[in-house]
From Swiss-Prot:
Cross-referenced InterPro entries: PRibForGlyAmidine_synth_PurL (IPR010074), PurL_linker (IPR041609), PurM-like_C_dom (IPR010918), PurM-like_C_sf (IPR036676), PurM-like_N (IPR016188), PurM-like_N_sf (IPR036921)
Source organism: Halorubrum lacusprofundi (strain ATCC 49239 / DSM 5036 / JCM 8891 / ACAM 34)
Residues annotated as signal peptide: none
Binding site for Mg(2+) 1: E95, N558
Gene name tied to this protein: purL
Binding site for ATP: Y37, D520, G557
Protein's name according to its UniProt entry: Phosphoribosylformylglycinamidine synthase subunit PurL
Coiled coil: none
Residues given in the record as substrate binding sites: S96, H97, N98, H99, R118, Q243, E315, S316, Q317, S560
Single Gene Ontology MF annotation: phosphoribosylformylglycinamidine synthase activity
HAMAP family: PurL_2
Length: 759
């Protein structure tokens, strides 16, 4: 990729001269789709991003949110006021590493984790949790399995080594990702009002320092690489654009960053990600309306004879750029040495242009001493123009149409249908994935992977000593969910994206939590194709409308376009990561309770599709064939999505509730199968096949000993008695005139397809 002729003309007009080679490379990367959001930024104003809980919103390395006090944690966000929030903050961010993970799945995924963790650190926060949402081609394809295994290995190795638990996420398999997998990773950090740092440079005369690994040539041009379709030979030709991670250096950098923030040495910070040092340093000073003067020869390097462009644009990992007061430089250097990290004074903040000087006498380990070489100015541009001056694209779009109803004829038997849906790789157990993650490191994980949402314990004491830990009904439980369903958004981008938001919110509600805020990772194909851009617009608008109705401000995110290859574009994929709160962290599991079986009933809270139900976007149709319109979500005129979710959360928190599980991928067939244990089963009656397999979100299966109390809490939401909880460890289904049953061993075998195939 090179700077386009129209962009080149704009740069020449701005500079009043021809740009240098280093300037051309900087503009090429910082004005790329990956950095500048040239095709998506015009659409992003649809998102609401404000609220009393929002301390730092979109535009920084990560969002910062104030946590409610424990007694207000169950209250919906719209009903809280500013006084309900304390001085304890969480950071929340999400990133994609899609193209790199296709070329090199292990390093591509690993460095995606490293990048979002450093985004968290740059806000003065300590990372406490990761979530990964992963999308691959058909599980039956060898290439997809290779990418799947490599990506999970990369995430698990990096996350485990740095001591940050991966506590949740999602995995989907769909033929549309065969030529371009998606790796979306979210990170949550913990900080407070006194430790908050931003990526806004503060004052001319302050020192700019680089701390972390030495700069090499890996990841060169990564931003521009991520802004193009994947070519057929990308796996070999684009390998230099993939970064190489070092999790042990990242762990030392995490602890060093913590020490720097503890001593109040950091005035502003930015991690080195897309476009490397050039991107981080120019964006840092641009946000402050300032400039900088950098000495590129001062950058500590791990390879000899690097030129100015390589030093500026290499995306070598585990590096941070800090603004520091001149009198604190020696202390920063001492702390970097303590943690065995490289450290360089690379320049200063100015009130002029963004200027870089280079003589070719860098700090590479094998370089000869050439300190007498004369420096020349290789970059001299206005920082704000470089960071924010890219013109936006005005692209044509075509709105997608809903498919007609064409159900399979003859339809499979009930036995066959349930077996195929429960054993589908997208709905099957993901135990093979999360068992590779150390999800308990940090002693905060109260609800582990495999449930609807993870819950992290935010205690009122900072101690991790078991004797000091607060009871499970004290403190704030932080609920986390992330994911998207490509079947939904391929069928109907707008309604599918609304469903993605509601489904993630229902995951939180199933554990008794209400939404606090969201971040999104908007993935699409080549936006220059009108039908692709139309689908992308649909997921943006759908997600924006649903999050607004959920009272969940969208406080940050990431856009990844040009996920297109010789196989075609990916389905529009709006990964949503949602964070919620509840008082305490003792939530009902997604597993039936045998001890209360004789005294409890199984209820379904919430309606199916408002149009009587539809199977569009369902796993049932993905397995059996056929098409249908996407289900119409519940009417929000009389009861908002936020009110619906609050009612479901209240049900989950009620003392009579022993188990809860949301209905989503695979419909009730999968939800019920996942609830069954060796000791507890379910005997369920449903009116028809649509009721078994439709995937309308916003519904909760509840095991309760007090159905009347649950119905009262549900308010206007429909309540359907599904049947009884049994002690035989079997799922028995009566659907119209059909009946079928599966014992716990059979269900375990069906759901264990990924473990079995990858053993």
């Amino acid at each position: 990729m090179s700077l386009s002729e129209p962009d080149h003309e704009l740069v020449v007009a701005e500079l009043g001269r021809e740009p240098t080679a280093a300037e051309v490379a900087l503009f090429e990367n910082l004005w790329s789709e990956h950095c500048a959001y040239r095709s998506s930024r015009p659409l992003l104003s649809a998102f609401e991003s404000e609220g009393d809980q929002v301390v730092v919103g979109p535009g920084d390395d990560a969002a910062v949110l104030a946590l409610p006090e424990p007694d207000a944690a169950d209250t919906p966000a719209a009903e809280r006021d500013a006084d309900d929030y304390g001085d304890q903050y969480v950071t929340f961010g999400v990133e994609s590493h899609n193209h790199p993970s296709f070329v090199d799945p292990v390093d591509g995924a690993a460095t995606g984790v490293g990048g979002i963790v450093r985004d968290t650190m740059s806000m003065g926060a300590y990372p406490i949790a990761l979530l990964d949402s992963l999308y691959f081609g058909g599980f039956d394809r060898e290439r997809s399995r290779y990418l799947f295994e490599g990506v999970v290995e990369g995430i698990s190795h990096y996350g485990n080594c740095i001591g940050v638990p991966t506590v949740g996420g999602s995995v989907a398999f769909h033929d549309g990702y065969e030529g371009n997998p998606l790796v979306n990773v979210a990170c949550v950090g913990l900080t407070n009002e006194d430790r908050l740092v931003t990526a806004t440079a503060q004052e001319p005369g302050n020192t700019l320092m680089l701390v972390g690994n030495g700069t090499g040539r890996d990841g060169l041009g990564g931003a521009s690489f991520a802004s193009e379709d994947l070519a057929e030979d990308a796996e070999t030709e684009d390998r230099p654009a993939v970064q190489v991670g070092d999790p042990y250096a990242e762990k030392r950098l995490i602890e060093c960053n913590e020490a720097l923030v503890d001593e109040d040495l950091v005035l502003s910070a930015r991690d080195l990600g897309a476009a490397g040092l050039g991107g981080a340093s120019s964006e840092l000073v641009a946000k402050g309306g300032l400039g900088a003067r950098l000495d590129l020869d001062s950058v500590h390097q791990r390879e000899p004879n690097m030129n100015a462009m390589e030093i500026l644009l290499a995306e070598s990992q585990e590096r941070m750029c800090y603004e520091v007061a001149p009198e604190d430089v020696a202390r920063v250097e001492a702390l970097a040495e303590r943690f065995d990290l490289g450290c360089s004074v690379i320049g200063e903040v100015t009130d002029g242009n963004y200027v870089c000087e280079f003589a070719g006498a860098g700090k590479g380990e094998d370089d000869a001493d050439d300190s007498d070489a004369e420096s020349e100015v290789v970059v001299d541009v206005d920082a704000e123009y470089l960071a924010d001056g890219a013109p936006m694209n005005d692209l044509a779009s075509e709105s997608p149409t809903q498919p007609d109803r064409d159900l399979p004829d003859p339809e499979p038997s009930l036995d066959e249908a349930v077996e195929s849906v429960v054993s589908a790789p997208s709905t099957a157990s993901k135990r093979w994935v999360y068992r590779q993650y150390d999800h308990e490191v940090g002693v905060r994980t109260a609800m582990k992977p495999g449930d609807d949402a993870a819950i992290m314990a935010i205690r009122e004491t900072a101690s991790t000593d078991a004797a000091d830990l607060a009871p499970a009904d004290q403190g704030v439980g932080l609920a986390l969910s992330s994911g998207a369903n490509p079947n939904w958004t391929e069928t109907d981008p707008y309604e599918g994206a609304r469903a993605v938001a509601l489904e993630n919110a229902t995951n939180l509600a199933a554990k008794g939590a209400v939404p606090l805020a969201a971040v999104d990772c908007l993935n699409g194909g080549n936006p220059e194709k009108p039908e692709v851009y139309g689908g992308f617009k649909g997921i943006v608008d759908g997600l924006a409308d649903a999050c607004a109705d959920l009272d969940a401000p969208v406080v940050g995110g990431n856009v990844s376009l040009y996920n297109d290859s010789v196989e075609g574009p990916i389905p529009p994929t709006p990964t949503l990561a949602l964070i919620g709160t509840r008082k305490g962290y003792n939530a009902p599991p997604a597993a039936l309770d045998a001890d209360s079986a004789g005294d409890s009933e199984l209820l379904l809270i919430g309606a199916g599709g408002a149009d009587g139900g539809a199977l569009g976007g369902s796993e049932y149709l993905a397995q059996a064939g056929g098409t249908d319109r996407f289900p119409t979500l519940p009417d929000t005129e009389t009861k908002s999505l936020a009110d619906r979710v609050a009612s479901l959360a209240a049900v989950a928190r009620h003392e009579s509730t022993f188990a809860t599980h949301d209905v989503s991928d695979g419909g009730l067939a999968v939800a019920l199968a996942e609830l069954v244990t060796d000791a507890a089963g379910a005997d369920v009656t449903l009116p028809d096949r649509v009721a078994v397999f439709e995937e309308t979100p916003g519904r909760l299966v509840v095991q309760t000993t007090d159905p009347e109390a649950v119905a009262e809490l549900a308010g206007e939401l429909p309540v359907l008695r599904l049947g009884e909880v049994t002690t035989d460890g079997a799922l028995s289904l009566s659907v119209g005139d059909d009946e079928t049953a599966f014992d716990a061993d059979t269900i375990r075998e069906l759901r264990g397809v990924i473990d079995r195939e990858l053993a």
